[in-house]
């Protein structure tokens, strides 16, 4: 077990550096990350990243000059193997404190493709919206609820990521790493 703990330290150090230093120093302005709430008759699609492990919404950053919705479709394809239609914007989740950024969340539906994990997201799985895993990072619960509520207009929510968010993320990550249940549900 000590070898597994030692392997986590570089990952946590990288995430700490990114969370404390990198986002405010971006030359292109505030960081915007794009996420998709992908819904189908199978449920909602969630993924687990290879670095900080816990269930989350697929998505990521735009390349320089890339429109947000195009970046979202590209990231979802890379991470899940699915091509999606972006139906509507759910909202902007403005996060201050650790890893300050805005998460721009869209409701999506799958068009084609086969669900497959990637090196970046080794686990991808459908979940019933009424039975989400307890290892879902808590900062994804509000965007999921907003997407499922089919609100008439996009929302803007402000969240502060302090020590509670950091410790919650670490607990989920450690549980996923050391659990025999690789899905963490």
What is each PLM-predicted segment?
Residues 93-116, 125, 129, 140-151:
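Active-site-adjacent beta-strand/loop module that shapes the phosphate/pyrophosphate-binding cleft
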Residues 53-54, 120-185:
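Nudix hydrolase/Nudix homology domain
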